[in-house]
Swiss-Prot record:
Function, in words: Involved in the efflux of sugars. The physiological role may be the reduction of the intracellular concentration of toxic sugars or sugar metabolites.
Membrane topology listed for this record: Multi-pass membrane protein
Protein name stated in the entry: Probable sugar efflux transporter
PANTHER family from the UniProt entry: PURINE EFFLUX PUMP PBUE (PTHR43124), SUGAR EFFLUX TRANSPORTER (PTHR43124:SF4)
A GO cellular component entry from the record: plasma membrane
Keyword check for Manganese: no
Gene from which this protein is expressed: sotB
Biological source species: Erwinia tasmaniensis (strain DSM 17950 / CFBP 7177 / CIP 109463 / NCPPB 4357 / Et1/99)
TM segment ranges: 15-35, 50-70, 79-99, 109-129, 137-157, 168-188, 209-229, 249-269, 272-292, 299-319, 333-353, 362-382
Record keywords, A-Z: Cell inner membrane, Cell membrane, Membrane, Sugar transport, Transmembrane, Transmembrane helix, Transport
GO molecular function: carbohydrate transmembrane transporter activity
């Protein structure tokens, strides 16, 4: 709840700025996917080796989300956001002047630490500053920020990287983050920490079987997705033999499809909660299984990316709403665990995709991701049967 009454316009403006912040944080997480080849060329490395930066980033977030959230649980939230942004901007400044791959990794670790705290607190903050009764819409706006990171942030970052160099991409992200920090400082009220939970909340949460089943579902599904998605740029160029410009276009429509998924979820997610989650995981799996056979057909692979992008967004929103519903008494701890587990999946998928491309071939990443996706779909169906509350959004 907000401590003082504000107009609906102001409330929505605050949510919008948090969504813009989400856009920035997700852009910097995802943009290396579109720059792997360029970064590899700068340091004379293979793309699979450069892909290690995706795994390290994700696993730093995974390992540090809960400890950083607990360490800062009593810090007033606006002040904490400012600290996060200062670390974020400084780390991007280092990325923009990185003289070797080790320096780049160090800068990415700094960004990952700020990311770890940001996603532990932001969903609950968006709900707190949103107009009364608009929780779902606030989360949907945050999700739109995430989707825009793929539809605008990632392809624009890739275009800047191709035109001016990947270092300039990181410099621009840092500059935009600095402006956003100043606007958030002006717009947000003081937000005392509340309902964060404590270290004691962790075993309590893991004694909730439905929540544990959901966390495992998230880990499996995200691992499956990122096994293929992490290497979509080199896959399209080296396996499909399509141009760099068309690769940028595919990244663009993948992200645009995520916005469609966000809108669909906000309208129909509460009406068909179980169907939406099962269908999303099924479509993610099908998309990866069909990636290789559709790769050389521009219309087919474009259609596939639209379906895949919609499904990934719906899946992400569906699990987030369920986590908040299953842990209303410790939202920040539950969300930090979600962020950590999600990033375990990102790191595992990026690592597995890299190993597949090195030891099998790049063409196989979709099939391996799809095989894990089938396991995820089976686990989802079983979990919903075993834990009926997972069939609902809350």
């Amino acid at each position: 709840m907000q401590t003082t009454p504000v107009s609906r316009k102001t409330a929505w403006l605050r949510v919008l700025m948090l969504a813009i912040a989400a856009f920035i944080f997700n852009t910097t997480e995802f943009v290396p996917v579109g720059l792997l080849s360029d970064i590899g060329s700068s340091f004379s490395m293979q793309t699979a080796q450069v892909g290690l930066m995706l795994t390290i980033y994700a696993w730093v977030v995974a390992l540090m989300s809960l400890p950083m959230m607990l360490l800062t649980r009593n810090v007033e939230r606006r002040m904490l956001l400012m600290i996060i942004f200062v670390m974020f901007v400084a780390s991007h400044a280092l990325s923009s002047v990185a003289w070797d791959f080790t320096t780049l990794l160090i800068s990415r670790i700094g960004i990952a630490l700020s990311h770890a705290i940001f996603w532990s607190i932001t969903a609950s903050l968006a709900i707190r500053v949103a107009p009364q009764g608009k929780k779902t819409q606030a989360l949907s706006m945050m999700a739109t920020g995430t989707a825009l990171a793929m539809v605008l942030g990632l392809p624009i970052g890739r275009m800047i990287g191709q035109l001016l160099g990947w270092r300039i991409t990181f410099a621009v992200i840092g500059a935009v983050a600095f402006v956003t920090m100043l606007l958030l400082l002006k717009l947000l009220p003081k937000l005392p920490s509340e309902h964060t939970g404590s270290l004691k909340s962790v075993p309590m949460l893991f004694r909730r079987p439905a929540l544990v089943a959901l966390y495992l579902l998230i880990a499996i599904t995200v691992t499956a997705h990122y096994t293929a998605y992490s290497y979509i740029e080199p896959f399209i160029q080296s396996v499909a033999g399509l141009s760099g410009g068309f690769t940028t276009f595919l990244l663009l429509i993948f992200g645009a499809a995520g916005i469609v998924g966000s809108v669909l979820f906000s309208i129909y997610g509460n009406k068909f909660p179980a169907t939406f989650l099962l269908a999303a995981i099924g479509l993610i799996t099908l998309s990866m299984m069909c990636l290789y056979v559709s790769a050389t057909h521009t219309l087919a692979v474009s259609t596939l990316c639209v379906i895949w992008g919609i499904a990934v967004m719906v899946m992400g929103l569906a699990v987030q709403v369920r986590v908040l519903a299953l842990a209303p008494d410790a939202t920040d701890v539950a969300m930090s665990l979600l962020s950590g587990i999600y990033n375990i999946g990102i790191g595992a998928g990026a690592l597995l995709g890299g190993q597949v491309s090195l030891h099998l071939n790049m063409a196989s990443v979709g099939y391996v991701g799809g095989a894990i996706g089938i396991l995820s779909l089976l686990w989802c169906a079983w979990s919903m049967k075993r834990h009926p509350q997972l069939r609902l959004n809350g």
